[in-house]
């Protein structure tokens, strides 16, 4: 009989612990639903007295199981206590997994859950979210199995770090005049592009519009002939008018008409209908000289190691290159040939040898035969006379 009682008491204790865990789970679900309802209401105002709950509910809930566990402490087997601990830990892991799956749905209402807690929610259920929960038995049964679940509410409550972006703040146009100009902005700012008409108020433009509406016939014209009648009638031209035609200097320095068929700008008479000008009645022309005509067509490099002397030439390019091209005259007694012809150079050398043979003694004079080059015509051999 004692053995039967010892085996029934652990089973009864296990059943009581399961019932207690079911009650805790039901309270946790009720707490989560109440937190969601409290967060959805915007006009929830709880006093500071309701935020601090007494610990009487926690002690009363824990005392319901304590006497039975203390009475049967000496009857528990170490193996049974280990099996109970492993069962409690397995259930607690399942409990935490269900709790973590439910927390993301209520994570967006973190402030009401931490700060505003309705008075109907027990403190025992909320303690599992903020601190470690011990599901182990008394001190003599074995070590406490504690686990600290990582709550998503602590991560969401952290303030976000400021980020640096490349988008500049919009600067109003009224403050542009106070900013310094750089580069092309300075050039554009120095130009007078502002019109005095744009600075007029709106009343000025409204008055101008009313004036144009009242005097529509004078302000609006459909035919250009009525605006400039003098361009169509040549009779209105003054008697002292002189026609002017435009010419341009070409590369040969001759004037040529810019537009041969263009009439006079004032009277409209073409150039072909005008007679030749005389000394009494000259014809006025306008001649334009392109800048490219004034510049030389070639660029001459001036030698930097020679001197310049402009006394022997009048040409501008040769005048600039005198120190480079002109050399002092060479003497005629030099032995350098005047041409690059090979036959003339050979004949010139033979004449020099003939002069030398005339001054030398007769015994040393030998007949000299000059062989013409292969590419020249055959010539008769020249023999030096012997004395």
Swiss-Prot record:
Q: In this chain, where does the modification Phosphoserine occur?
A: 307
Q: Which GO terms describe its biological process?
A: negative regulation of cell migration; negative regulation of G2/M transition of mitotic cell cycle
Q: Which residues form a coiled coil?
A: none
Instruction: Establish whether keyword Phosphoprotein is in the entry.
Output: yes
Q: Which InterPro entries match?
A: MIIP
Q: Establish whether keyword Translocase is in the entry.
A: no
Function of this protein? Inhibits glioma cells invasion and down-regulates adhesion- and motility-associated genes such as NFKB2 and ICAM1. Exhibits opposing effects to IGFBP2 on cell invasion.
This protein's assembly is summarised as: Interacts with IGFBP2.
What protein name does the entry list? Migration and invasion-inhibitory protein
């Amino acid at each position: 009989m004692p053995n039967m009682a010892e085996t029934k008491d652990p089973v009864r204790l296990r059943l009581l612990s399961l019932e207690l865990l079911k009650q805790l789970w039901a309270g946790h679900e009720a707490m989560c639903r109440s937190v969601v309802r409290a967060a959805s209401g915007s006009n929830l105002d709880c006093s500071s007295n309701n935020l601090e709950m007494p610990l009487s509910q926690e002690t009363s809930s824990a005392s319901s199981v304590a006497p039975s566990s203390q009475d049967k402490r000496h009857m528990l087997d170490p193996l049974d206590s280990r099996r109970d601990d492993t069962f409690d830990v397995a259930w607690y892991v399942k409990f935490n997994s269900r709790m973590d799956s439910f927390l993301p749905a209520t994570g967006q209402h973190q402030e009401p859950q931490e700060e505003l807690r309705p008075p109907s929610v027990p403190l025992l259920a909320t303690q599992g979210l903020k601190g470690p929960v011990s599901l182990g038995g008394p001190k003599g049964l074995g070590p406490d199995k504690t686990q600290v679940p990582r709550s998503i509410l602590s991560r969401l409550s952290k303030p976000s770090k400021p980020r640096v972006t490349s988008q500049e703040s919009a600067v109003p146009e009224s403050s542009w005049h106070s900013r310094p100009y750089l580069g092309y902005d300075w050039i554009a700012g120095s130009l007078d592009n502002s019109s005095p008409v744009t600075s007029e108020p709106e009343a000025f433009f409204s008055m101008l519009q009313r004036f144009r509406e009242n005097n529509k016939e004078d302000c609006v014209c459909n035919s250009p002939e009525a605006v400039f009648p003098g361009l169509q009638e040549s009779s209105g031209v003054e008697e002292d008018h002189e026609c002017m035609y435009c010419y341009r200097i070409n590369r040969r320095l001759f004037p040529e008409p810019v537009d041969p068929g263009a009439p006079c700008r004032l009277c409209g008479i073409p150039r072909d209908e005008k007679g030749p000008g005389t000394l009494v009645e000259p014809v006025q022309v306008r001649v334009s000289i392109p800048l490219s005509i004034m510049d030389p067509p070639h660029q001459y490099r001036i030698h930097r190691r020679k001197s310049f002397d402009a006394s022997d030439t009048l040409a501008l390019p040769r005048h600039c290159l005198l120190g480079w091209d002109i050399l002092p005259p060479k003497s005629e007694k030099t032995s350098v040939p005047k041409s690059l012809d090979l036959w003339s150079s050979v004949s010139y050398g033979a004449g020099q040898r003939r002069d030398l043979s005339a001054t030398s003694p007769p015994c040393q004079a030998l007949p000299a035969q000059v062989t013409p080059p292969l590419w020249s015509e055959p010539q008769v051999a020249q023999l030096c006379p012997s004395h």
